[in-house]
From Swiss-Prot:
Naturally occurring in which organism (per UniProt): Thermoanaerobacter pseudethanolicus (strain ATCC 33223 / 39E)
Cofactors named for this entry: Mg(2+); Mn(2+)
Residue intervals of the BRCT domain: 581-662
Name recorded for this polypeptide: DNA ligase
Similarity section: Belongs to the NAD-dependent DNA ligase family. LigA subfamily.
Length: 662
């Protein structure tokens, strides 16, 4: 490939994966694969310097911060580290350092696999904590960081300083969290790092407080009124002040000792109660660090040694298909057990049918397996030269292995999904969604009660909710006479919900509350929706081919039609309720919502505004007329204040609905 084209392709890939990792916290590739992409880009740009541009990801530290938290400019830029993957590269680093400053001592530390943060203390008091973001501007997550018990809120001395540390989740806490999420039908975190990042970025600090996060401090960024000679001295000082410093930090006299220590850490890796993805080598002398300086993206006085993902050879004994809580069918390889990274692996994800075809993975193949992100085992390569001719090709089923319903793969998607409302694999999540506030709004019917109803065999689908009796509910834990009667009343009241709420509550793939409104408004009855053809849906505004195929496939499934009939027989409303005439008090007005409202969900508030002629947008601009502010608002409030936009609270909003104070 032409170097210019390859550089362009690499930049696009890296920018995409930066976004997935830094902004969404949903990485798609392992750190090692990402590092290899970045390395190739850097090598090509060095070979062809005329192709290097200021906006290349090789010149950046990371991605942009999320917008939900207030942006915060770091006191000291939070640079990334250059990476080494071999002993030769470590020796090259050592040579460059010694050429610049002579003989040096190094410190070798664990490279914790977590989320990097900056903590600021003023006269001994913790004042601000922020995530790394793009290295220059991060997110202010002070309130969430205060929930981490290992972060001192007050230091031993009244000293002003800035430190950098790594927030992480211990493996035991990660496993416990995923077990709890599985019971509630929530999506599981892929690994402890993702769990730590997702937990720290919760808008509600109470959620963060329950997640058992921890932190290790690994660098003193800045301090007022004191001087230190070495990095080891700063760590000892920080420990005295009450910080939980990086637990393994060994002083080494030369690069040979460094290499030996890195190998010792590698051997220790599986025994640690938290994840590491390498070791960090730092110059110990702080004056020599100043002389060495830094590039635009990393310091010249430190380097990270990254351990490659461990790979092992084994055999594919079978390929089975598992059904997730969202109805996604995932092929899984059953393997001859093999020890990788301290655990025995007997299963590995194959992601989807395209992945199997692309790698040409067959039952009976000899394959190479690795643990991506140190957690999820995956098949990365087939050893085709070891094929015997007895291997069998795998065919992805078009029916759900759990319930037998049609499994549909929409155009442009890699995942095949079960369409069955009765599917046991997705039943808990489906009923939680059906009872949620924006769907049938059954007050008092939460995950804990739904879990009990399912485990006792009292319900097998959403329609069974409407056939529950007093004697069914009174046997449940924490359900007294009053709470049983309240729940039965809530179930009965939900029968009167509008058609779009019912349609949304069915959990049809791609059909959100807005699409459900459009469909219900057009077809008026559930019978009409069920009879409609693909082209009938695509003619509607905002309903594309994927959504049309999804809804047609859903109602083509016999078990779904039977459940609709059962709901109908229970007295659940199946028609569009004519809207009461409301005045267009918000005609031509643009609203932005920020924070949690007390009496409305975001969807309800949006619906109320739109029904009265208004429009709701996601960002504040000069064209915004009102910003409706709830509890814990984000940066939108600050921007509205800067632009002089009218800010209203929930009480003022309700007064406006009555025609007052507009």
């Amino acid at each position: 490939m032409d170097p210019k084209e390859r550089i362009k392709e690499l930049r696009e890939k890296i920018n995409y994966h930066n976004y997935r990792y830094y902004v969404l916290d949903q990485p798609e590739i392992s750190d090692y694969e990402y590092d290899m992409l970045m390395r190739e880009l850097i090598e090509l740009e060095e070979k062809y310097p005329e192709l290097k541009t200021p906006d290349s990801p090789s010149q950046r530290v990371g991605g942009e911060p999320l917008k939900e938290f207030e942006p915060f400019t770091h006191v000291v830029p939070m640079l990334s580290l250059a990476n080494a993957f071999s002993e030769g590269e470590l020796r090259d680093f050592d040579r460059r350092v010694r050429e610049a400053v002579g003989d040096v001592e190094y410190v070798v530390e664990l490279k914790i696999d977590g989320l990097s943060v900056e903590l600021i203390y003023e006269k001994g008091i913790f004042t601000v904590g922020s995530t790394r973001g793009d290295g220059i501007v991060g997110e202010n997550v002070t309130q969430n960081l205060k929930t981490i018990k290992s972060i001192p809120l007050r230091l031993k001395d009244d000293v002003s300083l800035v430190v950098r540390g790594e927030v992480f989740m211990p493996r035991a806490s990660f496993e416990k969290l995923n077990e709890e999420r599985e019971k509630l039908g929530e999506s599981l975190f892929a690994n402890p790092r993702n769990a730590a990042a997702g937990s720290l970025r919760q808008l509600d600090p109470k959620v963060t407080a329950k997640r058992d996060l921890d932190i290790f401090i690994f660098n003193l960024q800045k301090i007022e009124g004191r001087k230190f000679k070495t990095h080891i001295e700063t760590l000892e000082f920080l420990n005295e002040q009450g910080f939980k410093i990086i637990p393994i930090h060994k002083k080494c006299s030369n690069i040979d000792e460094v290499i030996k220590e890195i190998e010792e850490i590698r051997n220790l890796r599986d025994k640690l109660p938290y994840d590491i993805d390498g070791a960090v080598v730092k110059v110990n002398d702080l004056e020599k660090r100043e002389i060495l300086g830094q590039t635009a993206k990393d310091p010249r006085w430190a380097i990270a040694f990254k351990y490659p993902a461990e790979r092992k050879k084994t055999k594919v004994l079978d390929i089975i298909v598992q059904v997730g809580r969202t109805g996604a069918l995932t092929p899984t390889a059953i393997l001859e057990p093999v020890a990788i990274s301290g655990s025995v692996v007997s299963r590995a994800t194959l992601h989807n049918e395209d992945y199997i075809k692309e790698k040409d993975i067959r039952i009976g193949d000899t394959v190479i397996v690795q643990k991506a992100g140190e957690i999820i085992p995956e098949v990365v390569e087939v050893v085709k030269e070891e094929r015997t001719g007895q291997e069998r090709e795998f065919v992805m089923p078009d029916r759900c292995p759990e319930c037998g319903a049609l499994a549909v793969r929409l155009l442009g998607e890699a995942i095949r999904r079960c369409t069955g409302l009765n599917c046991p694999a997705q039943l808990l999540r489906g009923i939680i969604h059906f009872a949620s506030k924006d769907a049938m709004d059954i007050e008092g019917l939460g995950p804990a009660i739904i879990n009990q109803l399912l485990s006792k065999g009292l319900i097998h689908n959403i329609a069974d909710l409407y056939y529950l009796k007093y004697e069914d509910l009174i046997q449940l834990e924490r359900m007294g006479d009053k709470s049983v009667k309240n729940l039965l009343n809530a179930i009965e009241e939900s029968k009167t919900r509008d058609l779009d709420r019912l349609l949304f509550g069915l959990g049809i793939n791609l059909i959100g509350s807005k699409a459900a409104q459009v469909i219900a408004e057009h077809f008026k009855t559930m019978d009409n929706i069920m009879k409609a053809k693909f082209e009938d849906f695509t003619q509607l505004p905002d309903i594309g081919p994927k959504m049309a195929r999804s809804i047609v496939s859903f109602f083509a499934e016999k078990q779904n039609v039977e459940i609709i009939e059962k709901l109908k027989n229970a007295g659940v409303n199946m028609k569009k309720i004519p809207k009461e005439k409301v005045n267009n008090i918000f005609e031509g007005k643009t609203f932005v919502l920020t924070g949690a409202l007390g009496n409305y969900t975001r969807e309800e508030a949006t619906r109320i505004i739109e029904e009265r002629g208004g429009k709701v947008t996601n960002s504040v601009s000069k064209k915004t007329d009102y910003v409706l502010v709830g509890k814990d608002p984000g940066s939108k409030l600050k921007k509205a204040q800067e632009l002089g936009i009218k800010i209203i609270d929930e009480k003022q909003f309700e007064e406006m609905l009555k025609g007052e104070n507009i």
